[in-house]
């Protein structure tokens, strides 16, 4: 049997009940969890995975450590840190007092407008990511107010895709709500994850 592939993993996270799950884990803990989960994944028969979103450089460092034989794990293709809009699903400051943090920048994964979208993609390229992860709608495992509303404009999504293609990077999007999915497909992303509330009655894009 050939090695299996998993196209959506988050090695640095451990899913427990909502009551037990911390809102944020420390980077050191994330690195330990990611290394352990990579080893378990390889032993389970998966030889290639796509890591779609973490808190920073953990998956990039893990990918390189596996590649040079320092630790055991599958081959990893990673987006590094996700890209969100202010208050969106992957905004790391959601649920915190404005007195406790500075507004996150595109380099830190939060954008507003096409110009900042280009900045965020170029930073991911500089960081060593293989692709881009956008959170184009709300989600379940965050403290964003909505789980399905669109959180990127079409122009922002198109800017991300355009910049990513310039650097040979794929674009995967987290999407639960139909409007965000539609914008992502029109923008030309490579994959749409989750699709929880997809509407199949209205075609978004037809193959030639």
Please place each PLM-identified region on the residue numbering.
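Metal-associated gating/positioning segment near the N- to mid-region
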Residues: 2-70, 86-90, 155, 186-187
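Single conserved hydrophobic/aromatic residue that forms the stacking wall/gate
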Residues: 199-208
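Active-site mouth loops of central-metabolism enzymes
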Residues: 20-32, 101-119, 170
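Divalent metal-dependent hydrolysis catalytic cores, especially in the metallo-beta-lactamase
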Residues: 33-59, 73-82, 129-142, 170, ...
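Alpha-helix-loop-beta-strand connector modules within alpha/beta enzyme cores
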Residues: 64, 68-74, 79-81, 148-173
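Metal-cofactor-binding active-site regions of metalloenzymes
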Residues: 13, 17-20, 72-107
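Histidine-centered catalytic micro-motifs
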Residues: 2-13, 164, 171-178, 192
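Short, acidic/polar
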Residues: 30-38, 113-123, 176-180
């Amino acid at each position: 049997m050939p090695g299996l592939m998993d196209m959506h993993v988050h090695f640095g996270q451990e899913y427990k009940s909502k009551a037990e799950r911390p809102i944020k884990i420390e980077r050191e803990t994330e690195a330990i969890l990611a290394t352990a989960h990579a080893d378990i994944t390889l032993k389970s028969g998966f030889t290639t995975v796509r890591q779609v979103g973490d808190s920073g450089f953990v998956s990039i460092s893990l990918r390189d450590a596996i590649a040079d034989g320092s630790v055991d794990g599958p081959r990893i293709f990673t987006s590094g840190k996700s890209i969100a809009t202010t208050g969106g699903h992957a905004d790391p400051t959601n649920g915190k007092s404005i007195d406790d943090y500075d507004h996150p920048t595109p380099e830190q994964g939060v954008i507003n407008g096409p110009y900042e979208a280009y900045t965020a993609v170029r930073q991911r390229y500089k960081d060593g990511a293989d692709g881009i992860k956008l959170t184009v709608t709300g989600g379940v495992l965050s403290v964003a107010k909505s789980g399905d509303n669109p959180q990127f404009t079409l122009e922002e999504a198109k800017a991300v895709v355009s910049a990513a293609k310039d650097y040979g990077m794929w674009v995967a999007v987290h999407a639960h709500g139909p409007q965000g999915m539609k914008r992502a497909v029109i923008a030309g992303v490579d994959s749409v994850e989750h699709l929880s509330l997809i509407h199949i009655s209205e075609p978004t894009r037809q193959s030639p």
